[in-house]
Amino acid sequence: MQISKFFKFVFISVSLCGSLLFPQMANAYPVFAQQAYDNPREATGRIVCANCHLAQKPTEVEVPQAVLPDTVFEAVVNIPYDTKVQQVTASGTPGPLNVGAVVILPEGFKLAPKGRMSDELKAKTKGVFVQPYSKTRPNILVVGPILGEKNREVTFPILAPDPAQDKSVHYLNYPIYVGANRGRGQVYPSGEKSNNNTFTSTAAGKVTAIEAGDKGTTRVTIQTAAGEAKEQTVPAGLKVSVKTGDVIQADQALSYNPNVGGFGQAETEVILQSPNRVKGMIAFFFTVTVAQILLVLKKKQFEKVQAAEMNF
């Protein structure tokens, strides 16, 4: 128990340090959703990651058609995007995109322990830390942020439940929901915009000045109809879309949209198959096959008898 607590402390410490050292990855970290939402999937079916990642992008998931109880299988989440594209980091400099994903499994399904994973599956998941969403929801798995260039395909190792051990689980067809993002979010959980978003004017008026600010920011001064000068700061890394002398409206964009990423959802199904049903199907097909063979042999024997009688 003490060892487990120690590793948990180390993991949290490393995560916090990573958020400080690599701010461009911090606002995609699943901890934001984990802290704010007990369940990442809303009643409408929408996954809450879409609250911060506003653009829609494709996401695909692959799972076996059917699995046996108490067996390990994999769910492969595909997060397609152009690796040549770079995003605006928190510091305003261009950088590679990071990715993250969430897999919402039926209750009873959970993350497969390493001791149950094959060598091939261990190799596929090496360097990718998959964790349960929370202690109360072990059936929801999250990963990220991780560098997207090498992880456009993320493998989740999953352990299927055994109805013989868990009476709440049955041999049925179960849905699996998946969400995946590439790139930073446009909005922080607090509602504040990140610098991976379009910044708009807070007032209507005339642009009287555009000046370089601190740390790569840009100051835009707008003179309103009342003669009041309002100064707005466009974050570092964003390209200003207005020029001095322009007459603009309130909520008009002051910068171009820098976002190159986005979030996507997908869903699929998996059948928890009964071993007895599989054995029964095999026995049935075997019986049918043997019966057909016997019928063919009997038919040939009958034809030989008929031919012999005709010759006689």
Curated annotation (Swiss-Prot):
PROSITE patterns: CYTF. InterPro entries: Cyt-f_TM, Cyt_f, Cyt_f_lg_dom, Cyt_f_lg_dom_sf, Rudment_hybrid_motif. Its cofactor is heme. It is found in: Plastid, Chloroplast thylakoid membrane. GO terms for molecular function: electron transfer activity; heme binding; iron ion binding. Belongs to the cytochrome f family. One of its GO terms (cellular component) is chloroplast thylakoid membrane. The 4 large subunits of the cytochrome b6-f complex are cytochrome b6, subunit IV (17 kDa polypeptide, petD), cytochrome f and the Rieske protein, while the 4 small subunits are PetG, PetL, PetM and PetN. The complex functions as a dimer. The chain crosses the membrane at residues 278-298. This is Cytochrome f. Heme binds at residues 29, 49, 52-53. The keyword Heme applies. Component of the cytochrome b6-f complex, which mediates electron transfer between photosystem II (PSII) and photosystem I (PSI), cyclic electron flow around PSI, and state transitions. It comes from the Eukaryota. Residues 1-28 form the signal peptide. Binds 1 heme group covalently. Keywords: Chloroplast, Electron transport, Heme, Iron, Membrane, Metal-binding, Photosynthesis, Plastid, Signal, Thylakoid, Transmembrane, Transmembrane helix, Transport. Disulfide bonds: none annotated. GO terms for biological process: photosynthesis. Gene3D superfamilies: 2.40.50.100, Cytochrome f large domain, Single helix bin. Pfam families: Apocytochr_F_C, Apocytochr_F_N. It is a single-pass membrane protein. It comes from Emiliania huxleyi (Coccolithophore).
